[in-house]
UniProtKB/Swiss-Prot annotation:
Gene name in the database record: afoC
UniProt keyword Hydrolase present: yes
Gene inactivation effect: Strongly diminishes production of asperfuranone.
Annotated organism of origin: Emericella nidulans (strain FGSC A4 / ATCC 38163 / CBS 112.46 / NRRL 194 / M139)
Name of the protein in question: Probable esterase afoC
Bilayer-crossing regions: none
Length: 297
C-alpha cells in the first residue's frame, strides 16, 4: 500500500519536527501525497514550529483531478480515496455526485492510513496524532473518519487505528481532536466501524451514532447524536463552484463545534500569508478554547 510522502520537505525540517503533535493530511481526488505536500507549502511554513504534517497516499489509481496536469502533470500516478471506474474522468464523475452512490472500500482506506502512521513512526516521530486535514475528497474522508471515531468512542469500542497499529508493530495510537477541512463536500461517507473495531459487538448493534462520550449533556446527545461534534474548521473558497456542497458538510456537524474560514478563492488550497494566517488563527483559537496545551500554535 502507498504511504506518506516527505520527499518535498527538507529532511532537516522533518528531523526538527519529530516531537511535535502530528496531523494526518489527506489529498484531494486525482492527486497524491507528493502533490498535496506542495499544495500545502504555505500552510506548512506557518505551522513548522507547531505541528508535524504527514501526507498519506490514497489507495486507488485514477485520472488527474481538475487543473492538476497544468502544474503537476509529471507528478503521477494520481490517486483517489474512493474507486473510480476505469476510463472515467474523475472530475466529471465527482461533479455528477457518483462518489455518493458507490460502495466505499473502508479496508483500503484504513490500510493506507495505517501505512502512513507506521512509516512516520519508523522515521522517528513521537508526537501524538491529534488531527486530520483534508482537501476536497480528502476533506470528506477526514470528516467521515472523525465521525467514525466519535461513534466508536461513544460506544466504548477500540479505535481502529490503535488495534491495527499494534498488529503492525507501530507505537502510535490516534485520538483525533479536530479536523481542518478545505473544500469538503457533504454528506459524510459511511465508513462503518473499521476493520479493527468491534463492529459485531452488542454495543455496536444497539446504537447507530452518537456524540463523543463525556462531551455533552444527555439532552444534547439525544438532540445532536447524528451530528459530528468533534471540532472542525471548515475552509471555503467563495468562488468555488462547489461552495453549497461544502456548506452541506457543515450541516453534518454540531453548530457549536464548527469554525468557518472564508477566503476569496476557487477550488484550491489558499497560499497567501493572509488567507493561510486566518486558518492558523482558527487552529490557535481551537487549542486555547479547548485547553489543548500541547497544541498551542
Amino acid at each position: 500500500m502507498p504511504a506518506l510522502d516527505i520527499a518535498s520537505a527538507p529532511a532537516a525540517v522533518y528531523q526538527q519536527q519529530l516531537h511535535l503533535p502530528r496531523i494526518l493530511c489527506l489529498h484531494g481526488g486525482g492527486t497524491n501525497a507528493r502533490i498535496f505536500t506542495a499544495q500545502c507549502r504555505a500552510l506548512r511554513r506557518q505551522l513548522t514550529d507547531s505541528y508535524r504534517l504527514v501526507f498519506a497516499d490514497a489507495p486507488f489509481l485514477s485520472s488527474a483531478g481538475p487543473d492538476v496536469t497544468s502544474v503537476y502533470g509529471e507528478w503521477g500516478p494520481f490517486r483517489s480515496w474512493v474507486p473510480v471506474p476505469a476510463g472515467v474522468d474523475i472530475s466529471a464523475w465527482a461533479a455528477a455526485g457518483a462518489a455518493s452512490r458507490i460502495d466505499i472500500d473502508v479496508e483500503a482506506i484504513d490500510e493506507c492510513i495505517a501505512a502512513a502512521i507506521a512509516q512516520d513512526d519508523r522515521a522517528g516521530a513521537t508526537g501524538d496524532w491529534v488531527g486530520l486535514l483534508g482537501f476536497s475528497q480528502g476533506a470528506r474522508v477526514a470528516a467521515s473518519l472523525l465521525y467514525r471515531q466519535q461513534k466508536q468512542q461513544r460506544m466504548g469500542l477500540t479505535s481502529w487505528s490503535r488495534g491495527r497499529d499494534r498488529k503492525r508493530g507501530a507505537t502510535s495510537s490516534t485520538n483525533y481532536r479536530f479536523a481542518v477541512l478545505f473544500a469538503g463536500r457533504g454528506p459524510l461517507l459511511d465508513l462503518g466501524f473499521g476493520s479493527g473495531s468491534l463492529a459485531g459487538s452488542s454495543a455496536a448493534s444497539s446504537s447507530a451514532s452518537a456524540s463523543v462520550s463525556g462531551s455533552e449533556s444527555a439532552g444534547e446527545e439525544e438532540e445532536d447524536g447524528h451530528l459530528l461534534s468533534i471540532p472542525t474548521i471548515h475552509v471555503h473558497g467563495l468562488r468555488d463552484p462547489g461552495l453549497e456542497m461544502h456548506r452541506d458538510l457543515v450541516r453534518s456537524c454540531r453548530p457549536s463545534s464548527v469554525r468557518i474560514v472564508e477566503w476569496e478563492g476557487a477550488h484550491r488550497m489558499p497560499i497567501t500569508t493572509k488567507d493561510v494566517g486566518a486558518v492558523v488563527a482558527e487552529l490557535r483559537h481551537l487549542a486555547i478554547s479547548r485547553k489543548y496545551e500541547s497544541l498551542r500554535c
